[in-house]
Amino acid sequence: MRSRLAFPIFALVLMMAVLPAHAVTKVGKNIDITASNDPAERQQVEPTIAVDPRNQNIIVAGAQDYRLLSIGGHRWHGFYRSTDDGLTWTVSLVPGFPGDNSSQGLSSPLHAFQCTSDPVLTFDRNGNVYYTGITCSTPGFTLFVVKYTGDGATYAGTTLFPISTYHHADKPWIAVDTSGGQNDGAVYLSYDDVFAQGPQGATLVSSRDGGQTWSLPMAINPGGFDTGITVDQNGRVFVSSLSSGFPHASMFMSISIDGGHTFTTHRIFDVTELPRSLPGNSFRTFTIPQLASDSNGVYVVWDDYGLGNSNVMFSKSTDRGNTWTTPTRVNDVITGQHFFSSIAASGGVISIVWYDSRFGQLSNGTITGLNVFYAQSTNAGSSFSKNIRVTSASFNPNLAERADFGNTQPFMGDYIQVAASPGAAHPIWTDNRDACSNTVPIFGCTNQDLFTATIRF
């Protein structure tokens, strides 16, 4: 069934299509990216990951990295790179962090800031990495983009967006046109404009010269927030956003067919957002839809609380975003919580990952054993495989303390992510299996790490 009308999710959960496992052959070893490179054993959250389209053995990742706390600093964009398909990693911080007296650090426009947040990165077709985020200290939440060249090997500079023009930003997401068309190489950045003088909401900026200059901000859905973005194989730009009205919101899709110069926006679904903390738990949760696309269509996943627990929902469009399929549930059990879903598409395979509590939840809802699960589709989302456990050990998400301006609330970030290349998927997540190996005053548990694994099919 297809329609542009909004669907109530709770009425559709039973419509999930699940087939036997498709092409999954092996979930590889869980790799602790920061195990031996963070002597302070601090937290890393909100991970992001991308595979180099020129060389699938090269993978880059990022996260909010709290290692500077041990020397009086704060959270900062970590940058991690692998040249052996994710087996081993080099670890660094984006230049400009507090105490960075290198020439790159002193020349970075980030050098005046105390901390950064909301990391998301992507590759273009030429081996350039674009890494976005926001500052999180005076004078406000300022948007920035970092560029790495040489397949992510070389730092090439940082652009800071003037807050007087681009306002206070939140939750940026980034995508690059790799279509080979007239806008190939264009970089698109969506974010929440939270303090605009005019219409607030989902906003887009773009660059057509490799990040040297950027367009003025364009409001594409006033009142929208928590954007996701993808560029399809024909260069069309899709931006998802949610309306206000927590917990009952609507999802909107904004579409550009002219390289991001103009957008049309329409409402596609009703959504019940996750509560700010799941019942019985103290770490925070959000509903943040994520997008992917390939030659078969455009796909969206999100976490929905319409049945009184969190479920991973999926829909697709095969007509350039005009109509969307009835949402289906991806998690193949209804018990427990299933949240922080992420999606990627490559080589005819759709890959989805999420956090899942099916193996470790008390009767009051408290999660004691969290895992990462994976599902795939080889028929453009018409059905999904049996869910597959990715994590080799369960962990407690209510342990690690959030080292954030004196806030000691357990914190798992607001998202995890998956990247894909032909024949493989690469999830990345925040993991507490080694947390609380020791504690520090005020901030409690340490050693919350980034993990990844390679799933081959």
Give the positions of each predicted feature:
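Bacterial N-terminal signal peptides that target proteins for export
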Residues: 1-9
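Bacterial N-terminal signal peptides
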Residues: 8-17
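Autoinhibitory N-terminal propeptides
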Residues: 18-22
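C-terminal PAP-associated
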Residues: 23-457
